A protein has these predicted regions:
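Conserved N-terminal structural module of periplasmic/extracytoplasmic solute-binding proteins
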Residues: 2-114, 132, 179, 329-333, ...
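Short helix-initiation/N-cap motifs at beta->coil->alpha
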Residues: 81-92, 110-111, 188-194, 264-278
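Hinge/lid segment of periplasmic solute-binding proteins
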Residues: 109-164, 303-307, 373
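Periplasmic solute-binding protein
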Residues: 114-119, 143-183, 215-235, 317-324, ...
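Glycine-centered hinge/linker elements that transmit conformational signals in sensory
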Residues: 196-199, 235-266
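Extracytoplasmic/periplasmic substrate-recognition and gating elements
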Residues: 258-259, 297-358
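C-terminal capping/gating helix-and-loop segments adjacent to ligand/active sites or protein-protein/ligand interfaces
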Residues: 266, 378-430
């Protein structure tokens, strides 16, 4: 599978499972088509603000729409949800190009934000100038991702995906590895090579039939997410072939595949879901939203067996934005709504109810975030853990075709896991596929 919310790497943002008592994963389930989907006002005379979304952002489920309507009695909010970003995003581009059929508010996934900023910025309002929206309230790199060279900010961040590693305590114990989350984090602190070393120990001493990690692709995702560089330079040139960060992440992931430390699974497939349910792997790269997915697939039989530790290095995987098209009939009111929905207070409420990790650092000191724990994961202090990770995430240059490059690198890693190519041959195949996709 290529995409649910954006691709297999972003699909977890759709997972709709409880994160402890009331906490759910970021952007929840792709089964929800939105109960507030019509855009009429029924003759009430109220201003109806339409929200064009993909997946489930959780605003309605967390009660934020109802709260805003009570604060603003002349406003009605209706959302129109397309389940998968692979269907939503092409339609959004078509509407932007024709300048018709747009909702008052349109969501943009992080994998697409660079392309929208580069090619469609003139179609959106500058939300940096809207009352209630402050650059200082957001992570700097998150704000910059949606800001054009001329300083126009076309979207406000809804969430981010700070990284951790989720691990099975029962499997670690059986392999003679520590199970305390702080001691576990020390196994690989600061270095993904140490993560492989722990995996080698696990392979030698762990339970038969249990892989160290689910997939080489997930190892790569974690490693590249924690790197300074990625696929483009600041001038917008594609540099992945010569990037030392990509080379290092590929080296870590391809080694994991070649040494058979992985479960040879493709994330967000039925086979992967079943393996998670059965406990067939011991670790997984774990952004905040992944916790809910693990809980959903692990069910009651895995409760208390999983825990969460800091990743080898801080990184980010996931996150979205809300933008306001210039052609919208209610753009001023829509901009006010977007500023309110993405304010730290609302982001903290959304985390408490749905698990979407805030892109606004002021929310990290709020009790709903700061004291959050997850009973399913042994009362892991997820608010504290993910806040610390979020504040240390490296700033990466996001390019317009990051997802295309990412997908084809993942396909190359699968060739190694399947025994079809060695790492050098798999890299060559990945490069050919990327170059074809980019017409190079």
């Amino acid at each position: 599978m290529r995409s649910y919310r954006t691709t297999r790497r972003a699909v977890g943002l759709l997972a709709a499972a409880a994160l402890g008592t009331g906490l759910l994963s970021a952007c929840a389930s792709d089964d929800d088509d939105g109960s507030k989907s019509d855009s009429g006002d029924g003759g009430s005379g109220k201003t109806t603000i339409t929200m064009g979304l993909f997946g489930t952002f959780g605003f309605e489920e967390a009660g934020l729409y109802d709260e805003y309507e009570k604060l603003n009695p002349d406003i009605t909010i209706k959302q129109d949800v397309i389940e998968r970003n692979e269907n939503y995003y092409p339609a959004l581009l078509n509407h932007l190009t024709s300048n018709s059929g747009l909702a008052d508010v349109q969501a943009i996934e992080v994998a697409n934000i660079a392309e929208v900023v580069d090619t469609q910025a003139d179609r959106f309002m500058d939300l940096g100038k809207v009352d209630g929206a402050s650059e200082d309230a957001f992570l700097d790199w998150k704000w910059q991702q949606a800001t054009a060279d001329d300083g126009k900010t076309i979207g406000l961040g809804t969430d981010v995906g700070p990284m951790a590693v989720c691990y099975r305590k029962d499997h670690f114990e059986a392999a003679g590895l520590p199970t305390d989350r702080e001691e576990v984090a020390e196994l690989w602190a600061g270095d993904w090579e140490k993560f492989l070393d722990a995996g080698r120990d696990f392979k030698e001493n762990g339970p038969e039939g249990v892989a160290w990690v689910d997939s080489a692709d997930a190892v790569y995702d974690g490693a590249i997410a924690s790197s300074e560089g990625k696929y483009y330079d600041e001038a917008g040139e594609v540099i992945y072939k010569d990037s030392p960060d990509v080379e290092a992440a590929w080296g870590i992931a391809s080694t994991a595949a070649e040494e058979k430390l992985t479960g040879n699974l493709e994330q967000f497939t039925k086979q992967w879901d079943q393996a998670m349910s059965n406990g067939d792997f011991a670790t997984i790269s774990c952004p905040a939203w992944m916790l809910g997915y693990i809980q959903e697939k692990g069910g009651t039989k895995a409760e208390g067996k999983w825990d969460v530790a800091q990743s080898p290095r801080p990184g980010n995987w996931g996150g979205s934005f809300l933008g306001v098209p210039e052609s919208g009939p209610n753009k001023d009111e829509a901009a006010k709504l977007v500023a309110w929905l993405t304010a730290p207070e609302q982001q903290a409420k959304l985390f408490a109810e749905r698990g979407n990790f805030p892109s606004a650092p002021p929310a990290y000191d709020m009790e709903a975030v700061r004291t959050a724990t997850n009973p399913y994961f042994g009362d892991a202090p997820i608010g504290e853990l993910f806040s610390a990770s979020a504040e240390e995430i490296p700033v990466q240059t996001i390019g317009p075709k990051d997802q295309v490059i990412d997908d084809n690198i993942g396909n190359g890693l699968q060739l190694i896991e399947q025994g079809k190519q060695d790492p050098d041959g798999a890299w060559d195949e990945a490069v050919k596929a990327v170059d074809n996709a980019l017409d190079q």
